[in-house]
């Protein structure tokens, strides 16, 4: 995971100081990219601090449910969306709604995930295998517009899925470690349910930033030598991609340094 640490270091040392929506301020660069290869059951995961993998998996299952209410997250003691929910736990038409029930002008609903699985199975050479959460007609109704907003899936000649994610806004210290593992697991799930295998995860960032109140935490993380990537993720099979539960995911060999706490910029 040295490439992630190199990006942190670059933004810390070369990033321009910028005021932002939250009022905290950032150091940022625009347009960097990270690439991660899959090897067997290994998944890309940060070792220089602990990544809350239960939260990663529960959030992904929540997306796949098509939910926009934090009730499922709270039931599983995952509180990463609390700050943006209203008194009823609603977030507006965020990721789950767009992934599973994108509304057309005729009032029909499009299940992008089902379409992606079907296309991977039946037309893997397609250049139109795209997952999009940036619904411009509903952005104003979302309590937080999508940061990881769109990805394209491609299948290579060996039956390997390559996921290319575009993330318009990348909180490098808190958010991106989560996003890396989340889209790695999504790639594994899509591969499982389409008879393929996971090959590569590419992440292209728009505004890649470190919040000013994360600077000391980033320096601490950069002082740590990355541990060997030995983490394997085993996933029990299910009839379809939507029927998975948390207990299906078994993480083995994850070695990490202690947690580094930081405040989320809201």
Swiss-Prot record:
Enzyme class: transferase
UniProt EC number: 2.1.1.45
Compartments, record wording: Cytoplasm
Gene Ontology terms, MF aspect: thymidylate synthase activity
InterPro entries xrefs: Thymidate_synth/dCMP_Mease (IPR045097), Thymidate_synth/dCMP_Mease_dom (IPR023451), Thymidate_synth/dCMP_Mease_sf (IPR036926), Thymidylate_synthase (IPR000398), Thymidylate_synthase_AS (IPR020940)
Pfam families per UniProt: Thymidylat_synt
SUPFAM superfamilies documented for this protein: Thymidylate synthase/dCMP hydroxymethylase
GO CC annotations on file: cytosol
Function: Catalyzes the reductive methylation of 2'-deoxyuridine-5'-monophosphate (dUMP) to 2'-deoxythymidine-5'-monophosphate (dTMP) while utilizing 5,10-methylenetetrahydrofolate (mTHF) as the methyl donor and reductant in the reaction, yielding dihydrofolate (DHF) as a by-product. This enzymatic reaction provides an intracellular de novo source of dTMP, an essential precursor for DNA biosynthesis.
Subunit organization: Homodimer.
The protein, known as: Thymidylate synthase
Organism placement in taxonomy: Bacteria, Pseudomonadati, Spirochaetota, Spirochaetia, Brachyspirales
Gene name of this polypeptide: thyA
């Amino acid at each position: 995971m040295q490439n992630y640490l190199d990006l942190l270091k670059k933004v810390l040392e070369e990033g321009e100081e910028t005021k932002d929506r939250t009022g905290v301020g950032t150091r940022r660069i625009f347009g960097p990219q990270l690439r991660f290869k899959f090897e067997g059951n290994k998944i890309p995961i940060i070792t220089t601090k602990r990544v809350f993998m239960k939260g990663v998996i529960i959030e992904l299952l929540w997306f796949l449910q098509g939910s926009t209410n934090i009730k499922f997250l709270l039931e599983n003691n995952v509180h990463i969306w609390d700050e943006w929910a209203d008194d009823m736990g609603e977030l507006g038409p965020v990721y789950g709604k767009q992934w599973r029930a994108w509304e057309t002008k005729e009032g029909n609903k499009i299940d992008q995930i089902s379409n992606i699985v079907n296309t991977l199975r039946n037309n893997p050479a397609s250049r139109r295998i795209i997952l999009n959460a940036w619904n411009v007609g509903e952005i104003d109704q979302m309590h937080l517009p999508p940061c990881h907003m769109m990805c394209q899936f491609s299948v290579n000649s060996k039956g390997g899925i390559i996921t290319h994610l575009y993330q318009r806004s990348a909180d490098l210290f808190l958010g991106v470690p989560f996003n890396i593992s989340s889209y790695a697991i999504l790639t594994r799930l899509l591969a499982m349910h389409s008879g393929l295998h996971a090959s590569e995860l590419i992440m292209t960032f728009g505004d890649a930033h470190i919040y000013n109140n994360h600077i000391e935490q980033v320096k601490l993380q950069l002082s740590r030598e990355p541990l060997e990537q030995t983490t394997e993720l085993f996933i029990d099979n299910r009839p379809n991609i939507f029927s998975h539960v948390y207990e299906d995911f078994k993480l083995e060999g994850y070695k990490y340094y202690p947690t580094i706490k930081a405040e989320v910029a809201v």
